[in-house]
C-alpha cells in the first residue's frame, strides 16, 4: 500500500516517487520475496523448482518504472527530476537494487558504468573526497565519500556467472533463485566475495558477455 500508482515509491504513501525510495522499495520487495518463498511448491510429490516464474506484480511494476526514470547524475524526484538531495545516498540505493536483483541494466541503462562515470567526474581532485550539494548531511565529505565508496567497491567483486535474458517470456529464468544460491554457496566455499548478474540479449555487448566465465 506504499507503492505509487506509477510503480515507484515515495518516502511515505501519497508522496511522489523518488529515485532513492524506489530503489529502497525494489530492494525491500526482493528481500521479502526471498524470505517468503523459501518453500517451493510440491506437485504430485515433485518439487517445482524449474518452471517459468514471474516476479511479483509489485516488483515488476517498480522495475519497469525505474527503467524508464533512471538517472545517475541526480536523484529523480517529482515531476521535474531536478533533485540533488541525497544524491550519494541515492546512488548507494541504486547499487543495492542492482546487486540484489542481479540486473546489469535498468531499462536501457548500464547502471554501474553510468554511476562510476559520474562519481569519477565528481571526485575532488586534491582531497579525493566527494561532497554533496544543497543537502546538509552530504555536504560533509565523510558522509558523501562513504556512500561513493560503497557504490564503487562492489565493482571489484568478480562476476562468476550471468543469466542470459532473451525473448519476451520467462523461459530463460526457469529457476529464479538458483544462480543466486549457487553464488552464495560458492562464496562461502572459496571465502571470497563474488557476484552474479542478468544480461539482456538486446543490450549486452560482447565485452559484457565476456565478463562472465559462465553464461546460463
Describe each PLM feature range.
Residues 1-117, 121-160, 170-174:
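An alpha-helical repeat/solenoid feature that recognizes helix-turn-helix modules
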Residues 156-214:
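Aromatic-Pro/Gly-enriched surface loop or interdomain linker
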